[in-house]
């Protein structure tokens, strides 16, 4: 499935149809390494690790996860916009295939290894609990599972699932499923004008960010556990990254780096 991209680059051969890619001799610029993005990602990882290790002074290190969501929104939106502007279309199927190839093998390997280790170390009682968590994590719904189970992310007492960190991967994958479809819908609604598409994309993102942030504030006060794991209360972070990608995309010859 494809959608016509927002514009043709100056001096490039005009596209002849909705699914037309670059013409002969028109190389498509590839994503480049972004040292600043990788550096920010490293800082976020370190903050989360120090928080989990209970290092004094890093009790708020969990905000590294928020930074990750902003980075994800920035990179994925940047790749989609870049593909549209350089190829004249967005391949939804290709996007999903790349996500599967990049995420599924390692994710599945860690899941299987963790479940087996849980049975080996903790016996059937622990193994069964971790296996149940793994079943949800395998379909990228760990965040929904932990929210429904009433898991308190900030309460480290009692049993803590070794797969609890899969909740953030669930939020990201849910975003990856829906966001390209929304971009596709915007492209179909405003198929004739690149400027209209860009403005509509920004408008949709602003509404998404404001609504999600308001819902996050409300839910955090009334249901903090659900608010922590919910994709609806996290959408504003991904949306901010997406807004940055759209704002910085004009005139860029390379897609955002980061190996997405």
Where are these regions (language model features)?
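Membrane-interface helix/loop caps of multi-pass membrane proteins
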Residues: 2-17, 21-260
């Amino acid at each position: 499935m494809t959608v016509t991209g927002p514009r043709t680059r100056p001096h490039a051969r005009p596209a002849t149809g909705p699914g037309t890619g670059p013409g002969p001799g028109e190389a498509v610029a590839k994503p480049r390494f972004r040292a600043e993005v990788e550096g920010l990602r490293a800082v976020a990882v370190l903050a989360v690790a120090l928080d989990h290790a209970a290092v004094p002074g890093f009790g708020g290190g969990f905000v590294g996860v928020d930074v990750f969501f902003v980075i994800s929104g920035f990179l994925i939106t940047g790749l989609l916009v870049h593909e549209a502007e350089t190829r004249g279309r967005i391949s939804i199927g290709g996007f999903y295939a790349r996500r599967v190839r990049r995420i599924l093998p390692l994710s599945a390997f860690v899941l299987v290894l963790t479940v087996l280790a849980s049975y080996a170390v903790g016996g059937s009682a622990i193994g069964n609990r971790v296996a149940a968590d793994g079943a949800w994590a395998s379909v990228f719904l760990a965040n929904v599972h932990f929210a429904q189970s009433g898991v308190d992310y900030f309460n480290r007492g009692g049993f803590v699932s070794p797969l609890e960190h899969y909740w953030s991967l669930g939020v990201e994958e849910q975003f990856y499923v829906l966001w390209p479809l929304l971009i596709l819908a915007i492209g179909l609604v405003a198929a004739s004008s690149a400027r209209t598409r860009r403005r509509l994309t920004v408008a949709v993102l602003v509404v998404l960010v404001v609504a999600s942030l308001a819902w996050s504030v409300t839910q955090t006060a009334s249901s903090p556990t659900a608010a922590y794991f919910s994709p609806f209360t996290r959408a504003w972070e991904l949306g901010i990254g997406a807004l940055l990608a759209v704002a910085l995309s004009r005139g860029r010859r390379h897609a955002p780096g980061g190996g997405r």
